Amino acid sequence: MTKQETVKHLVGVLSDAQAIVFTEYRGLSAAQLRALRILLRGDASYLIAKNTLARIAAQQVGFNDFAEFLRGPTAIVAVDGDIVSVAKSLRKFAETDGLLKIKGCFVDGQVFGSEHVKRLAELESREVILAKIASVTKGALSSALGLVSAPLSSAARVFVAMKNTF
């Protein structure tokens, strides 16, 4: 792949990504990188490119704020799915492996350091949060239904009692 093709590919990846995480991959073997790519598959792609080409692609997309992360052996994690699950996977891999270092991230147009990625990894997944919201909503709806139906059932009992007495 030529440098122009690499920049074009990076521009496409960066512009389509919901979030971007920067990692240092110094010391990781090819097998470890392959394992990391497999771990991230579906939610993100793990790209390694020359920092100069990544910087050019970032400028073309309009991301000028994360040049600080493009020093040393830097890989780009382009998040297509849930940022929380990607952050959890990266943290788990970094803890297990010990060589992967998270440099920072770019989420919703803002640049954050590695601590933000660690905090994202501590959040519950999107599915768990949605399940909790559904549970709370269901409980509130059940309570509201009980409040509405209680007077109606009381009135029905009064009518049945009146019918039985007359």
Curated annotation (Swiss-Prot):
Similarity comment: family membership: Belongs to the universal ribosomal protein uL10 family.
NCBIfam families for this protein: PRK00099.1-1
PROSITE patterns xref list: RIBOSOMAL_L10
CC terms in the record's Gene Ontology section: large ribosomal subunit
PANTHER family: 39S RIBOSOMAL PROTEIN L10, MITOCHONDRIAL
Origin superkingdom: Bacteria
Keyword rRNA-binding included in the entry's annotation: yes
InterPro entries: Ribosomal_uL10, Ribosomal_uL10-like_sf, Ribosomal_uL10_bac, Ribosomal_uL10_bac_type, Ribosomal_uL10_CS_bac
Coiled coil: none
Keywords: Ribonucleoprotein, Ribosomal protein, RNA-binding, rRNA-binding
GO molecular function: large ribosomal subunit rRNA binding; structural constituent of ribosome
Subunit structure: Part of the ribosomal stalk of the 50S ribosomal subunit. The N-terminus interacts with L11 and the large rRNA to form the base of the stalk. The C-terminus forms an elongated spine to which L12 dimers bind in a sequential fashion forming a multimeric L10(L12)X complex.
Organism annotation: Tropheryma whipplei (strain Twist) (Whipple's bacillus)
GO BP field: translation
Biological function: Forms part of the ribosomal stalk, playing a central role in the interaction of the ribosome with GTP-bound translation factors.
Protein name, UniProt field: Large ribosomal subunit protein uL10
